[in-house]
Design a protein with these regions (language model features):
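Alpha4 helix (beta4-alpha4-beta5 surface) of REC/receiver domains from two-component response regulators
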Residues: 59, 80-95
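Short amphipathic alpha-helix used as the core "switch/output" element in two-component signaling
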Residues: 36, 58-69
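Acidic catalytic/metal-coordinating carboxylates
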Residues: 29-33, 56-59
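Active-site beta3 strand of CheY-like receiver
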Residues: 41-47
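Two-component/phosphorelay signaling modules centered on CheY-like receiver
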Residues: 8-26
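Feature captures the catalytic ectodomains and active-site-proximal regions of enzymes
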Residues: 16-17, 51, 86, 95, ...
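Active-site residues of response regulator receiver
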Residues: 49, 77
């Protein structure tokens, strides 16, 4: 490190103390000498006085930053002037210490800057190894969806810590632990999903979103904006939570996506408040769309929302629904948002994350950008903070709206191909299929031969569903190799996994 102070000779005890702790300390008595030393050496840290002959500390700092903009700096000075503190903060000085300071104070400040990441990385490693066994023990005692949510949040928090501080090679262990948990989760869903669909009040599944989170606010004459970001995973929500908390008070909860964990089922359920079998009974055209595997299965969400408002006797509310599937459409929404703020209920559907998941299996460039879960998190986080969406969120935080952000389902990176026996009329999904007499190994799939028990549409005789479990995906034997090369290691949805089914709900109000 380099210590710059015109009275450096008075600081010899401090320098000796730092050297006894293993630091090498160079010194300078003025800013010009410090500038020369900085050009000729690569220091890890600068200790800097403000009041010196010639150029002062802030001028010296500007010269130093020209050479290395990211070098950390501790300012140690007698001055308590607030303007100097403000200037130091604006110049991204890491710490500001006021003389006199003890050797130990300076050592602690240096250690916090130079060794912080290493200390946190080591502690993260040891803490995870302790929690590893506790997670495995807790896995044996799970009896409810709340237990699963709590466990999954712990796993996601470890993923985020490894993203930030390094994983010391533990990412693979965490990945294997998540796979193990997913196997147990799949068994839990197979055994309990039918019961979850029978709950009429406070349903945790997709049809309960409106009644649980929006209706209480609407009945209290509060303005509400629901934002459904298609295919956004829990880890992607939590990675931007600190940023959102700078704008909103946030209550974090969850819901469970319907099976199959796909947009035609779960997102329609959010806006209609209906299960898929109820939906096709109330809206017969939906049945035709399903039977023909047609596009546009979600094009009536606006009508579904209005009908749901009517069923709950709040149809007098002014409503605006908007679906955004392209950047330009998002920019248009941003330009007109002040008009939409006159409404009582805003509904916004955003397809960016879903398109990213689908396109990453088709484009080599996206495969490079989103090679794994960490890359996926980083890409979504960057989009949140740098797109039109960020402007919209900031405007909403300053409005009188309560904002409910959620997703219809998540996604999972698939790695295990399994063969399916089906006729040519079966649906084309990678993680789920429906049709006549579908068959596969039930070790890696939930085979639903009585769809009506799970509130799924029965679209013909001998009709059944296959729902992939864990990280499996479906292939037909005649095209297996071609599609395996395309789908292996891609992000898909429609099946059973914590990543797909356990979906955060953020209820937010600006400060």
């Amino acid at each position: 490190m380099l210590w710059v102070d015109d009275e450096i000779h008075h600081l010899k005890p401090h320098i000796l103390f730092l050297e006894s702790k293993g630091y090498r300390v160079s010194t300078a008595t003025n800013g010009n000498d410090a500038d020369v030393l900085n050009k000729n050496n690569r220091y890890d840290l600068i200790l800097l006085d403000q009041t010196m002959p010639g150029i002062d500390g802030m001028e010296t700092l500007q010269k130093i930053k020209i050479q290395r903009i990211s070098i950390p700096v501790i300012m140690i000075t007698k001055s308590e002037d607030e303007w100097l503190m403000d200037e130091a903060i604006s110049q991204q000085v890491n710490q500001f210490l006021i003389k006199p300071v003890s050797p130990n104070q300076i050592y602690i400040a240096c250690k916090q800057i130079l060794e912080k990441n290493k200390i946190i990385e080591d502690r993260t490693t040891s803490d995870y190894l302790k929690d590893f066994q506790k997670i495995n023990d807790d896995l044996d005692n799970i009896i409810s969806t709340d237990d699963w949510w709590d466990l999954y949040i712990r796993l996601v928090q470890w993923q985020l810590k490894f993203d930030e501080y390094g994983d010391s090679g533990l990412s693979n262990i965490l990945g294997e632990q998540i796979q193990s948990c997913n196997k147990s989760f799949s068994n839990f869903i197979e055994n309990n999903y039918e019961g979850l669909t029978q709950k009429t009040n406070d349903s945790l599944l997709s049809p309960g979103i409106f009644q649980n989170y929006l209706l209480p606010l609407i009945n209290n004459n509060q303005k509400v904006c629901i934002i459904v970001i298609d295919c956004r995973r829990c880890d992607q929500f939590l990675s931007v939570l600190p940023y959102l908390e700078s704008l909103f008070n946030i209550e974090l909860s969850y819901h469970i996506s319907l099976l199959p964990s796909a947009t035609p089922y779960s997102r329609n359920a959010i806006f209609s408040g209906l299960y898929p079998d109820e939906l096709i009974e109330k809206y017969p055209n939906q049945k035709e769309l399903f039977m023909n595997h047609a596009d546009g299965l979600n094009k009536y969400e606006h009508k579904f929302l209005l009908d749901q408002l009517d069923r709950h006797d709040v149809s007098n509310k002014r409503v605006h629904y908007h679906k955004i599937w392209a950047i330009e459409e998002g920019k248009k929404f941003r330009k007109k948002i002040n008009d939409y703020l006159e409404k009582d209920v805003l509904a916004l559907v955003v397809n960016f994350v879903d398109m990213l998941a689908h396109d990453s299996s088709k484009m080599d460039v996206l495969k490079e950008i989103v090679p794994d879960e960490s890359g996926y998190r980083l890409t979504v986080k960057s989009w949140i903070k740098n797109s039109w969406f960020n402007d919209v969120i900031k405007i909403l935080s300053q409005s009188d709206f309560h904002v409910v952000i959620t997703s219809d389902h998540g996604s999972i990176r698939v790695n295990k191909d399994i063969m399916v026996s089906a006729d040519r009329d079966a649906s084309s999904g990678v993680r789920y299929k429906y049709g006549r007499n579908l068959n596969t190994n039930n070790k890696n799939a939930f085979v639903i031969n009585q769809p009506e028990r799970y509130k799924l549409p029965v679209l013909g005789p001998q009709f059944n569903y296959l729902i992939a479990k864990n990280d499996a995906y479906f292939l037909y034997p005649n095209d297996a190799n071609r599609y395996k090369n395309k789908l292996q290691n891609s992000f898909q949805h429609g099946g059973i996994s914590m990543e797909e089914l356990l979906v955060p709900v953020l209820v937010m109000k600006g400060y």
